[in-house]
Amino acid sequence: MRILFMGTPDIAAECLKALYAAGHEICGVYTRRDKPVGRKQVLTAPPVKEVALEHGTPVFQPRTLRDGSEDANIQALAPELIVVVAYGCILPRSVLEAPKYGCINLHVSLLPKYRGSAPVQWAVLNGDAETGVSIMQMDEGLDTGDVLVCEKMAIDSEETSGELFDRVTAAGARVLCETIPQIAAGTLKPQPQDHANATLAPMLDKELAEFRLTDSAAHIHNWVRGMNPWPMAWFVTGGRKVKVTECRAVASNGEAPGTVLATKPLTVACADGAIQLLHVVPEGKKPMDGTSFAAGLRLKAGDTL
């Protein structure tokens, strides 16, 4: 099929690779503009742009599509279908209605749950047992279109957002490629979303990543998994931030939150249960295991962290 692809980050790049491998004709690629990255602010192309250029596909990087400035170009490209994966720009009706088969979007949640920019992370943060991928027919709303296909997958209780994202990326690319022939054949039955059951998955930030030892052990465990690899969950002790990259929730005997129960591994009481701080990054220091962190603070059982 003749496809115009729109996407920006790694998950979009993997989907674009899969579309090339499946033999589709990619007539053009829209992505966000190159941006400065890292401490040296090196101007860096989006992953999707790199994949497109490797295949000799024309790349377009407009600031917006909403002003109609790209309508003529999109019409000239004459796509049968527009595929959108984490593009980052809103598509106006003129674009949505341009292709024969309209526009479809890959969303990495079981819609209508977790509409928005961070569905994988919020599934982990909330301790969900399952998530999945959805292919929807796009409309003018935010992840509100009719669902064409969805596929469920289990979330492991120790899985981080990064690990889960790798799995949903692979599943999403596969399901996307399986869906397109069904669109061409007209065999899919779009299912309207139940908007009353919709939930949102807003973007994460560093402040949101904070937890307290007065939280439950289950909450802390989910927060540490869900905020990994970015922005990393953290708490404050002695006036300094400590990031936690790996932990384990365990039982306690009802000790006061913050009480050190053991140092090998470092185990601290919470509001409900206890948490083993397996790997941490103290502010201004290198990553270390929890036992080394406890030794540096000369902690012993019975102390308060």
Region locations from a protein language model:
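N-terminal Rossmann-like dinucleotide-binding module
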Residues: M1-R39
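Structural motif corresponding to alpha-helix initiation and N-cap regions
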Residues: A13, V42-A45, D67-D71, C89, ...
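N-terminal beta-loop-helix "entrance" segment that forms/cooperates
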Residues: K35-H55
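Active-site-lining helix/loop region of Rossmann-like oxidoreductase modules
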Residues: E178-V236
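Internal alpha/beta domain cores that form substrate/cofactor-binding pockets in large enzymes
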Residues: R2-L4, E25-V29, H55-L77, I82, ...
